[in-house]
Amino acid sequence: MVFKNLADYHLWAGWKMRELLSTLDSDDFSEEKCGTSPRELVQHIVLALETCFYFIEGEKDQSVFDRVKRYPRQELLKRWEVLDTRLSQAIEEIPQDKVTVKHIKEEPFEVDVMDFFLQYLIHTAHHRGQLSKILSQMDLEVPGTDYIMFLGEIS
C-alpha cells in the first residue's frame, strides 16, 4: 500500500504544480527568479524523467533531449504529466531488477530499479519545491503539496 500511495502522491503533487503553471503566460513562465525560471525548472524535470526512461528502456535515440528544450509551455507541461504517470506506474509495480547507471560518474554502477525510480521521484519533489519558491515570489498562491496533505485529501 505504501508504494501505491507514493505513486499516487507523485501524480497528485505534480498535477497541482502543473495546474498552477498552466495559468502563467509565456512571459511569467520564462521570468527568472532566484537564478532560474519556471520554464528552466520544468525543462530540467522533464529532461531528468526522460533520462530515467532512456536508461531503463535502453533507448538509442537521443533527439528527445534536444526537443524538450524547444517545447512550448503547454507541451512541456503535458510531457511532464505523461512522464510522471509512467514513473508512478513503474513504482506501483515495485520492480525487482537492477539497472546500470552510466551517467553519474565515470565508472558505471548497478542499483536496484526501484531505487533508480525513487531517485527521480525525489528529484522531482526537490524541483517542485524550487518551483514553489519561485512562484510564491511571483505573488502566486502556491498549492501545498506535502505528502501529509495528500493523505488528508484521499482519506
Q: What residue ranges belong to the model's regions?
A:
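Short, contiguous alpha-helical
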Residues: 4-19, 26-66, 105-155
